[in-house]
């Protein structure tokens, strides 16, 4: 399947399942959207890689996606990939590339206390891009920054298919430091967390607003690349890496859950 050629209007890239809610949200707005989702399991998680590693790997994946699928627009549905590689990848291809970056501007606009929590990967938290967002939009704000690699791994391994009590327990552990700090806005700055956004909001309660970048990214993607009638209906999910039966079964289930065709493995 690695040399399979198909054409899709929209391409979504992530290291794992994080970008699936973004792809799904676009298809909710445009049910017949032609879309390919590529999970780069070879390099999961991006959040503990160096900037140079992420740039090199994202470049290779994007080149493969361009060659095999000829998308009209690419969405980097991963904060770690976006803060590290967005500008580099935009210079690499002729089609628009939309990034997913921490929704700090939105968080500042929502915050009354100017005390904001950011939950992300380690490399997103420490990257200068995130520091620039804080400086540009968050003057006078106090930021509580926290990485949670454990929750990301749990979500990647299928937490969303477990009973809700188990999901809620994992999310409650993750938000406890933010509750203790008294933040009034929490930014979900890793796309994996968006899978359980409703539980984040339930756990922090009405005194805190949970924000993410999903709606803004989908709006921007459709504004830059309106759907075309000649490319309709085909929506597929690919995964990079060794042809592992457990991974295949897990991603086939994810694909079905989000209304995509499980298309198999992509060699990158």
UniProtKB/Swiss-Prot annotation:
EC number(s) on file: 5.1.1.3
Organism: Treponema pallidum (strain Nichols)
Gene, per the UniProt record: murI
Highest taxon listed in the record's lineage: Bacteria
Functional note: Provides the (R)-glutamate required for cell wall biosynthesis.
Family: Belongs to the aspartate/glutamate racemases family.
Active-site residues, as the UniProt record annotates them: 78 (proton donor/acceptor), 190 (proton donor/acceptor)
Molecular-function GO terms, alphabetical: glutamate racemase activity
Database matches in SUPFAM superfamilies: Aspartate/glutamate racemase
Family matches, as InterPro entries: Asp/Glu/hydantoin_racemase (IPR015942), Asp/Glu_race (IPR001920), Asp/Glu_racemase_AS_1 (IPR018187), Glu_race (IPR004391)
Pathway recorded for this protein: Cell wall biogenesis; peptidoglycan biosynthesis
Record field: catalytic activity: L-glutamate = D-glutamate
Protein keywords: Cell shape, Cell wall biogenesis/degradation, Isomerase, Peptidoglycan synthesis
Positions that bind substrate: 14-15, 46-47, 79-80, 191-192
Name of this protein: Glutamate racemase
GO biological process: cell wall organization; peptidoglycan biosynthetic process; regulation of cell shape
């Amino acid at each position: 399947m690695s040399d399979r050629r198909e054409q899709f209007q929209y391409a979504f890239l992530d290291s794992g399942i994080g970008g699936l809610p973004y792809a799904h949200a676009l298809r909710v707005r445009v049910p017949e959207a032609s879309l390919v989702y590529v999970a780069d399991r070879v390099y999961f998680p991006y959040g503990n890689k160096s900037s140079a590693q992420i740039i090199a790997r994202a470049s290779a994946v994007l080149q493969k996606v361009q060659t095999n699928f000829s998308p009209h627009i690419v969405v980097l549905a991963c904060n770690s990939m976006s803060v590290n590689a967005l500008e580099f990848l935009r210079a690499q291809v002729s089609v628009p590339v939309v990034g997913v970056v921490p929704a700090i501007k939105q968080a500042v606009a929502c915050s009354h206390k100017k005390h904001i929590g950011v939950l992300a990967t380690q490399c997103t938290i420490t990257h200068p891009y995130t520091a620039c967002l804080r400086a540009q939009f968050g003057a006078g704000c106090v930021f509580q920054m926290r990485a949670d690699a454990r929750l990301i791994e749990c979500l990647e391994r299928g937490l969303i298919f477990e009973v809700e009590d188990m999901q809620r327990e994992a999310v409650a552990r993750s938000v406890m430091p933010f509750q203790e700090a008294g933040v009034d806005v929490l930014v979900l700055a890793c796309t994996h967390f968006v899978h359980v956004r409703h539980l984040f909001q339930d756990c922090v309660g009405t005194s805190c607003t949970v924000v993410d970048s999903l709606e803004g990214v989908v709006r921007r993607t459709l504004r830059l690349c309106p759907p075309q009638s000649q490319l309709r209906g085909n929506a597929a999910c690919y995964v990079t890496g060794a042809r592992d039966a457990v991974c295949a079964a897990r991603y086939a289930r994810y694909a079905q859950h989000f209304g995509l065709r499980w298309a198999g493995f992509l060699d990158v």
